A protein has these predicted regions:
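Bacterial N-terminal signal peptides
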Residues: 5-15
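Sec/Tat signal peptide C-region and signal peptidase I cleavage site
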Residues: 15-21
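C-terminal capping/extension segments of zinc metalloprotease domains
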Residues: 21-77, 107-127, 166, 211-297
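Membrane-active amphipathic alpha-helices enriched in small hydrophobic residues
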Residues: 27-31, 176-189, 195-207
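Short, highly charged
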Residues: 72-109
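Acidic helix-start/capping segments at beta-turn-to-alpha-helix junctions
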Residues: 90-104, 116-124, 180, 244-245
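Active-site scaffold of zinc-dependent metalloenzymes
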Residues: 124-149, 159-166
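Catalytic Zn2+-binding segment of zinc metalloproteases
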Residues: 143, 150-151, 160-176, 188-189, ...
Length: 297
């Protein structure tokens, strides 16, 4: 048991500089400024550098089948839009810690190559969001519900699963939003700021609200698997779902979550049906309560 614990500590020491390098606030500073001030020129020029060349010499997004670089750019813009509404918690130690945990769990997935970014935002709502390209946000209200690192890993793994399975990207691809954007972006990506921002803003709405039940159930199953692979006690996510399920339906902190997600009781039932007693044989998983980062306020 002690060997497993010290191995996890060693791995975290390796990924600590990487987590610092992937600071979400610094990465999206210009995008957030653009979303709040309406200045998107710099963002569009960056987007252009990741796209293919159009007939007029301008760079174009391949919205229908984006490359990994384009997926990252889409997620970057959408996340910047979300952060324009709710800022990151001003606690560098918290953000660093969440990035360390998230990056370690994400490395257990088949999209370990993505430059994953994680952040905690100033909102007392209980919720979490993911965007294409490896961007994951959880609210301060949800973080308050957590009691140990395994539970944090469980929450993050659910959002990681959404990215790995391209749940939000598929909705964007199916929607008329991409048809709206493709006509413009296929010509000149910097031509019309209003239409571009409509696409990005609506994408943020989709990432925050709109997934069907099957996608949520799949993310729960995959999340438990990723958490277990990462060496954590596998019941972190179910414990969080159970705690949220005990929150009154009329409480404002869960109003959006209950409106846009299956009820936690239904999610727990589906998890039980899918997993059964197979986790009973998992030994040595850690909760790591002793190093769980406590909020300062």
């Amino acid at each position: 048991m002690r060997v497993i614990y010290f191995f996890l500590v060693f791995i975290f020491a390796i990924f600590m500089p990487q987590a610092q390098a992937l600071d979400l606030g610094e990465t999206l500073k210009d995008v957030v400024k653009g979303s709040t001030a309406g200045n998107t020129t710099g963002n569009q020029s960056k987007a252009s550098s990741t796209s293919s060349t159009g007939s007029e010499g301008k760079k174009t997004f391949n919205w229908k089948s984006p490359s990994p670089q384009e997926e990252i750019q889409i997620g970057r813009e959408i996340t910047g839009n979300l952060l324009g509404a709710s800022a990151l918690v001003k606690d560098a130690a918290l953000q660093k810690y969440v990035n360390q945990v998230g990056r370690w769990v994400a490395n257990q997935s088949e999209r370990a190559d993505l430059p994953w970014h994680f952040g905690v935002i100033e909102s007392e709502d209980i919720n979490a969001f993911a965007a294409p390209g490896g961007y994951v946000i959880i609210t301060k209200g949800l973080y308050r519900k957590l009691e140990n690192e395994a539970q944090l890993a469980g929450v993050l793994s659910h959002e990681i699963a959404h990215v790995v399975r391209s749940h939000h990207l598929k909705i964007l691809q199916k929607s008329q939003l991409l048809d709206l954007g493709a006509g413009l972006l296929g010509k000149q990506i910097g031509k019309d700021n209003q239409v571009i921002q409509k696409v990005i803003g609506s994408g943020a709405e989709i990432c925050a609200r709109s997934l069907d039940k099957s996608a949520e159930f799949e993310a729960d199953r995959m999340g438990v698997s990723l958490t277990t692979r990462a060496g954590y006690e596998p019941y972190g996510l179910p414990e969080v779902l159970q705690a949220i399920g005990q929150t009154g339906k009329n409480e404002s902190s869960v109003a959006l979550l209950f409106k846009t997600h299956p009820h936690p009781d239904d999610r727990l039932l589906k998890l039980d049906e899918a997993i059964g007693n197979r986790l009973d044989n998992v030994k040595g998983g850690k909760t790591l309560s002793n190093r769980f980062y406590k909020l300062k306020n």
